[in-house]
Amino acid sequence: MKNKNIVKLFFVSMLFIMACKAYVEEKEQIDSLSTDVSTLNNKIDHEKFNNYKQEINKLKESLKDVSNAELKEKLLALESLFQDKLAAKLAALKAAKQKIEEITDIDNNTAKSKIWAESKLVGATIKFSGSNTAGNGKKMSEEAVKQIDKIIKFLEEGTN
């Protein structure tokens, strides 16, 4: 009888250790993601935003049956931080698009530099058309706005 109790105690102890280990791993994963998400800025590629959203969703799915309030609170804080970073990225994209659209004399090199710089600031990559040929600034502007629109659409659809 004493041996049965010792065996039961051993298995209960093992289950407890496994549960503690799982808790620590999940907590570390949330902390790691929080650290990564906090470093996101407007220059970061839009694909990274989508990757982080997918990681958060996986984590959320794995924790849906967990009743630990601390983990759920950390996950909510992580989601909130991500949404704040995403909103900032979308606002920066829309502001850059508006600035590019407001540039009037788009065929001079200063305007082309502004178009290129605004695009670069939000992670859109466009070709700098530096020649004095008329129409190149307009092409740059159209390409920048088109790319920014694609990024906005991708972020709005892919992260909601």
Predicted segments, located by residue:
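N-terminal low-complexity, Ser/Thr/acidic repeat segments characteristic of secreted
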Residues: 1-160
